Amino acid sequence: MRVLNNVTEAIGNTHMLHLSKIADEFGVQGNIYAKMEYLNPGFSKKDRVALQMITEAENAGLLVPGQAVVELTSGNTGTGLAIACACKGYKFIVCMSKGNSMERARMMKALGAEVVLVDQMPNSVHGQVSGEDLALVEIEAQKIAKERNAFRADQFNLEACNHAHEKYTAEEMWEQLDGNIDVFVDFLGSGSTFAGCSKTLKKHNSSIKCYVVEPETAAIYSGKEITDQGHKIQGGGYSMDLPLVDKKLIDGYIQVTDEEATDVARKLAKLEGVFAGFSSGANVCAAIKLLKSSEKGKNIVLTLNDSGLKYLSTDLYEEL
């Protein structure tokens, strides 16, 4: 293994894990293959999009030495940007809802970021960030970007985010599994993982089915009634339109409850030694549901999005 010049060179090329014990536990026929994105330097898949946004902005002359970078985050993209900015010498200001777990804010501050915490809506529940909460963070990010003439690393709109998964994550999946992929599932956050991976996987094999995963109470893409935006699956399910997602790539929809995502995340830890977050549990839960129904016997690939270390202040894992 070569010596790295800086930690951004460690982003990507994550391992692929066959979740055989989980499949046995739930009695399903087929294979669940999980890309271990929580092993990136910032402990999430968002390191990829963070680096890609900075790199493409530099190449386009949109980000120059001495300029600051600003973005909103649930914690993961912000951590990735904090790492990239630390390595490249940019000032980074991050805006985050107070509803997200504070481990993330502390980590970003440790990495040199200026952290701006934004109040939730009056009717919101701590630990359950809604689209309305995120809109408040967006307002603050826009304000700071204007005041400081900062580059806005806009994870919900910049095509660079799709490119990170289109050019790298999906190609790694294809190579690691020798093309033996039938299904891809993804819990929608900003939508870039779904959009980028689906586009590339379908280019390799148009018969690969790509499913959107959403919270059961906030399944806007499947067209279901929104009954509660305040779900526990942090990092996504915001009940909002996602410009990066090409709906023509969607082959189906799966809904997951808070309890299901939590249960599967805990089982991942105890059975597979995988310490991951809520959305990873949601992805694996969706795969299990498909293997029990329409995709029985198939090979399903997904990402394990982030580390369980980011959720120690939540009820995802039991207290001592």
What are these regions (language model features)?
Residues 1-320:
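PLP-dependent amino-acid enzyme catalytic core
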